[in-house]
Structure formats: structure tokens, C-alpha cells
Curated annotation (Swiss-Prot):
Keyword hit for Phosphoprotein: yes
InterPro entries, alphabetized: AB_hydrolase_fold, NDRG
Family of the protein in this entry: Belongs to the NDRG family.
The protein's name: Protein NDRG3
Biased composition, class Low complexity, residue ranges: 330-346
Positions of modified residues (Phosphoserine): S331, S334, S335, S338, S341, S352, S361, S374
Domain of life: Eukaryota
Sequence positions bearing N-acetylmethionine: M1
Pfam family, one: Ndr
Ranges of biased composition (kind: Polar residues): 347-359
Modified residues (Phosphothreonine): T322, T329, T332, T355
Length: 375
């Protein structure tokens, strides 16, 4: 873990700040598109070219962020190039959240979370994309989950960071209304992303995102997106009953990797989501020494996890995976069939010495337990 911590500390600042200390969420070799849908215009950024019949990696950011501030530290991380050389990446910005977005006209009705999900099929059609592997954070994770529930044929896999499957309760709603009277939207967003420990322990990171939220995101548009997220419906997903046909259950059908930092405000929500998903195709990754933005603070660990996830789906089998293999520990595991992710198997390869190691003794393996990994 000490070695990983050293990597983390040297990675953050170059990714987030330039030599003058200003924010640096730069895009590289990208094409931008504004695509009209029945629910309004959506801004999309394409990185790379689609590779044959392979799915495209499609990302969706959280409230207070856009694709640059949410994902570029991750996708610009050196080890991610091993993945991006095999996949095109499609970054979706929620309406009005992209850099330089103008304010919506007075009376504009911002799309609901369900409508934001329904803006994605026209995007795929416009770009001639057949399927996706989605990576979503917070609100973006909810949107991609809704999209996968409505269009399972278009989604091969999901990486859901800080996902909350529940509607906002009336107590939470009332609290947010009251806090809105005394707290500005920037502080509300920061409390959504970061726990108290991280707010106090990582002032440079917090200041970077405070300035980004306050200065780079249109504040009127941000309030509309925040209101839409606060008005979300429950995803109404449910864990399949043992022996029951999975088609009768409303749950995610694709391979799913849930990710949360152990200091994130979203821990309880992610654990709740995990309890509702099919354990056969779900992995829960808890990241130690990490808060609300694991893709920014621990890009190395998340990259390694994503490589395993893709390998389990049959992609990039030759990818080198060493960092996570040295550090991972397993709290519970599933006994799954062939062709599935090493994250979801009881036996995994030790890449450093070529041997295999059993994560749990056979008497505690249970096909109906979700695989949990901490690193």
C-alpha cells in the first residue's frame, strides 16, 4: 500500500494543475459534437476512432463537473493508454454543463434524470455506435443505470462510481431546501463529492474543485442539473430470487463494477445498490485511502480494476496487470463460470509470479454472494 500511496501523490497535481497552478483538465485529440435529441441538445466529445464491432467506452459525469473535470485525469493517466488504444471513448456532458455553455432561456424545462437517459440512444444513432461500456459517476452513474435498464441490448458493461439507486427521501429533500437558504450551491456540491475527512485533509484537491465548480460551470445551469438529480426516481432494481428466471427481475443484465472510496459520502448508497444487483455479474470495489473521486485521486488503482473488468468481458486479454494484483484483498467471492472477470472468480492469477491464489476457502464460497474487492 505504501508504494501505491507514493504513486497516488505524484499523480494528482500534474493531472489537475499546470505550472501556474491553474486547473488543467485538457482534452487530447478529440472531436466535439452537439447532437439534437427530443429532450434538447447534448454535447459529446469523441476520443479515438471506433474499433470494428467493439463497444465504445461512454462516460457520464456527476453534478458540478463536466467530462473534463470528472474523467480527464483518469483517461490521461499513462496506464490508461493501454486501454484507450483498443477502444474509442465517448464523453457525454449533461445539457448546459460543458465548458463555456450559455445559460438556458427563462422558463426552460431541464430534462429529468429519466429524460437524460433517453437522450443517449439518439447519440449512439448519430455516431453510428452499436453498444457501449459505460463509466458513470454519481448522477452520471444513475443516468447510465437507467439507460441500461431501458436499453439492455445497447450496454455490454457498466462501471458505476458512487451510484445511488434510491430516490431522494423527503427528509433529504427538506434538508437540501433548508441548506440552500444558507449555503451556496458550490458548498452543496462539494459536500456531495467529498466527506468531512477529505474536505479537511486534502485542501489542494478541494480548492481545485471549488474553483472549477464556481468558475468553470454555468451556475444557473448547474442549479437546474442539481434539481433534476434531487428529483430522481428510485431505480426500482431488485436482486433476482434464487431459482427465478432473471428476465422476471428488474435488474442490470450486464457485467457491473461498483466503485466507491472508503471515505466517500456515497458508501452507504453504493452498498445499498450492491444489495439490489445480481451477485453473479456484480463486483463491489472498495478503494482504501480514497474519497469521493477515485478516478482522480487513485487513477492507477482504478485503471488496474478496469483492465480486469474488460478482460473478464473478453477484451484486451494480454493487458499487463501488476499493481492491483500486488495490493488487492478479497472479503468475499463468487464461484462463477468461465469467461467472466477475474474480479468475479474465486481463483485469480498472480501476475508477478505466474501462480494462482485462492481468495477464499471452498467452504465459504457462495454463488449468490457479490464479489467484494478492496485495494
Amino acid at each position: 500500500m505504501d508504494e501505491l500511496q507514493d504513486v497516488q501523490l505524484t499523480e494528482i497535481k500534474p493531472l489537475l494543475n499546470d505550472k501556474n497552478g491553474t486547473r488543467n483538465f485538457q482534452d487530447f485529440d478529440c472531436q466535439e459534437h452537439d447532437i439534437e435529441t427530443t429532450h434538447g441538445m447534448v454535447h459529446v466529445t469523441i476520443r479515438g476512432l471506433p474499433k470494428g464491432n467493439r463497444p465504445v467506452i461512454l462516460t457520464y459525469h456527476d453534478i458540478g463537473l463536466n467530462h473534463k473535470s470528472c474523467f480527464n485525469a483518469f483517461f490521461n493517466f499513462e496506464d490508461m493508454q493501454e486501454i484507450t488504444q483498443h477502444f474509442a471513448v465517448c464523453h457525454v456532458d449533461a445539457p448546459g454543463q460543458q465548458e463555456g455553455a450559455p445559460s438556458f432561456p427563462t422558463g426552460y424545462q431541464y430534462p429529468t434524470m429519466d429524460e437524460l437517459a433517453e437522450m443517449l440512444p439518439p447519440v449512439l444513432t448519430h455516431l453510428s455506435l452499436k453498444s457501449i461500456i459505460g463509466i458513470g459517476v454519481g448522477a452520471g452513474a444513475y443516468i447510465l443505470s437507467r439507460f441500461a435498464l431501458n436499453h439492455p441490448e445497447l450496454v455490454e458493461g457498466l462501471v458505476l462510481i458512487n451510484v445511488d439507486p434510491c430516490a431522494k427521501g423527503w427528509i433529504d429533500w427538506a434538508a437540501s431546501k433548508l441548506s440552500g437558504l444558507t449555503t451556496n450551491v458550490v458548498d452543496i456540491i462539494l459536500a456531495h463529492h467529498f466527506g468531512q475527512e477529505e474536505l479537511q485533509a486534502n485542501p489542494d484537491l478541494i480548492q481545485t474543485y471549488r474553483m472549477h465548480i464556481a468558475q468553470d460551470i454555468n451556475q444557473d445551469n448547474l442549479q437546474l442539473f442539481l434539481n433534476s438529480y434531487n428529483g430522481r426516481r428510485d431505480l426500482e432494481i431488485e436482486r433476482p430470487i434464487l431459482g427465478q428466471n432473471d428476465n422476471k427481475s428488474k435488474t442490470l443484465k450486464c457485467s457491473t463494477l461498483l466503485v466507491v472510496g472508503d471515505n466517500s459520502p456515497a458508501v452507504e448508497a453504493v452498498v445499498e445498490c450492491n444489495s439490489r444487483l445480481n451477485p453473479i455479474n456484480t463486483t463491489l470495489l472498495k478503494m482504501a485511502d480514497c474519497g469521493g473521486l477515485p478516478q482522480v485521486v487513485q487513477p492507477g488503482k482504478l485503471t488496474e480494476a478496469f483492465k480486469y473488468f474488460l478482460q473478464g468481458m473478453g477484451y484486451i486479454p494480454s493487458a499487463s496487470m501488476t499493481r492491483l494484483a500486488r495490493s488487492r484483498t478479497h472479503s468475499t467471492s463468487s464461484s462463477l463460470g468461465s469467461g467472466e472477470s477475474p474480479f468475479s472468480r474465486s481463483v485469480t492469477s498472480n501476475q508477478s509470479d505466474g501462480t494462482q491464489e485462492s481468495c477464499e476457502s471452498p467452504d465459504v464460497l457462495d454463488r449468490h454472494q457479490t464479489m467484494e474487492v478492496s485495494c
